[in-house]
């Protein structure tokens, strides 16, 4: 076989690869932390605390928090017995999965202005539910920051996004 140029899916760097995996000689955790650092450079100074969407948003949130010198809090607690919600085939299952998967940590978010960091938005299902969850938990403000560019087109080989109209970018 002829050796072909490697063309990894960008989602390997953003989400799929384990944080301790190496991609092109660099740890995925470091890529993700750097994404948060770069995001912080572009963002306004808002928020009392930085809250990651667990678990994949944690490295970017750490980078963001370190750059902005804003406290890092686990404002969302993940149930590790619930799997990936964005790959479920139906919207109602995805929405229900978010409620099972995450809960707000009220003691760390009450009356706080939150900078919420997630790695990506595929459809927007998770993000909108989480923002509501944080407000219901007592957050004063929620400022969403995403550490990867918007997903605009279908991916027939990787993430479960078959139609352009499903992308969260369609709603912005």
Question: Where do the PLM segments sit?
Answer:
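Active-site-facing substrate-recognition patch
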Residues: 1-46, 83-94
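Short glycine-rich phosphate-binding loop at a beta-alpha junction
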Residues: 47-54
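Flexible loop/turn segments at secondary-structure boundaries
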Residues: 57-61, 79-85, 122-125, 149-154
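Hydrophobic, well-ordered secondary-structure elements that form the walls
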Residues: 64, 120, 142
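Short, glycine/charge-rich flexible loops or terminal/linker lids adjacent to PRPP-binding catalytic cores
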Residues: 69-115, 152-159
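Phosphate/diphosphate-binding loops
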Residues: 113-127
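A short, conserved beta-to-alpha structural element at the edge of catalytic cores
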Residues: 132-162
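Single conserved hydrophobic/aromatic residue that forms the stacking wall/gate
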Residues: 163-172
């Amino acid at each position: 076989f002829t050796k072909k140029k490697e063309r990894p899916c960008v989602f390997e760097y953003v989400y799929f690869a384990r944080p301790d995996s190496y991609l092109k000689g660099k740890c995925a955790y470091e890529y993700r932390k750097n994404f948060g650092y770069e995001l912080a450079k572009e963002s306004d100074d808002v928020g009392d605390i930085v809250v990651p969407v667990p678990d994949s948003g944690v490295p970017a949130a750490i980078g963001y928090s370190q750059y902005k010198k804003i406290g890092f809090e686990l404002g969302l607690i993940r149930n590790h017995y619930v799997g990936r919600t964005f790959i479920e085939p139906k919207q109602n299952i995805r929405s229900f999965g978010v409620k099972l998967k995450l809960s707000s940590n009220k003691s760390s978010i009450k009356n706080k202005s939150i900078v919420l960091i997630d790695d990506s938005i595929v459809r927007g299902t998770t993000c909108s539910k989480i923002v509501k969850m944080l407000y219901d938990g007592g957050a004063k403000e929620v400022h969403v920051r995403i550490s990867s560019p918007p997903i605009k087109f279908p991916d027939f080989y990787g993430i479960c996004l078959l139609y352009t109209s499903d992308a969260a970018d369609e709603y912005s």
